[in-house]
């Protein structure tokens, strides 16, 4: 069985192949999310504590959290479920997944380091892989660098170097939800336009109501005049 160990603190991961069944017994009958001591796995893992985050069997079927079964099962999955991505709106499909209990027929078991042990593991805890991209939203940039609302966020955007042929330049993401005098002016202009449109609609409605009342009054007067003429002709 292969152990795919990740170390989120450093952003690194390493895949280790273990053939001795006795070393793997500590993981059997354990569920996803449970923590396991790494002393029995090997001397280099002494003092380490791992959390089981997932795995898949030799046919590639992944483990699914919440399915209390050590073997493969078929479930009707929809949007929002793990181990399934719908291709159409409202689509559901019956898919084969493994339960969340670790069994012997797994090919790869995914682990995450919760507590570091006595010694470093080469390629896992002794190296650091920095994040390729920094935060993009204005509030997240402020939180990341500990800035106040008065500080200019645009000076602190994480830029990355790009090499294209002989040219070397830097790229920065577009800051989302950035409040600038220009955006505030646009907001005020939009609000003023809405108020203006509403006033125009009210004026048009009042003008139409006035015209309608005038037409009704004219029609009423016209009918009264016709009645008057008929009455006078009958008398004559």
Curated annotation (Swiss-Prot):
Gene3D superfamilies: 1.20.5.2650. The keyword Phosphoprotein applies. InterPro entries: Ribosomal_eS6 (IPR001377), Ribosomal_eS6-like (IPR014401), Ribosomal_eS6_CS (IPR018282). Phosphorylated. One of its GO terms (cellular component) is ribosome. GO terms for molecular function: structural constituent of ribosome. One of its GO terms (biological process) is translation. It comes from the Eukaryota. The modification Phosphoserine is found at residues 232-233. Keywords: Phosphoprotein, Ribonucleoprotein, Ribosomal protein. Belongs to the eukaryotic ribosomal protein eS6 family. This is Small ribosomal subunit protein eS6. It comes from Debaryomyces hansenii (strain ATCC 36239 / CBS 767 / BCRC 21394 / JCM 1990 / NBRC 0083 / IGC 2968). The lineage of its organism: Eukaryota, Fungi, Dikarya, Ascomycota, Saccharomycotina. The gene is RPS6.
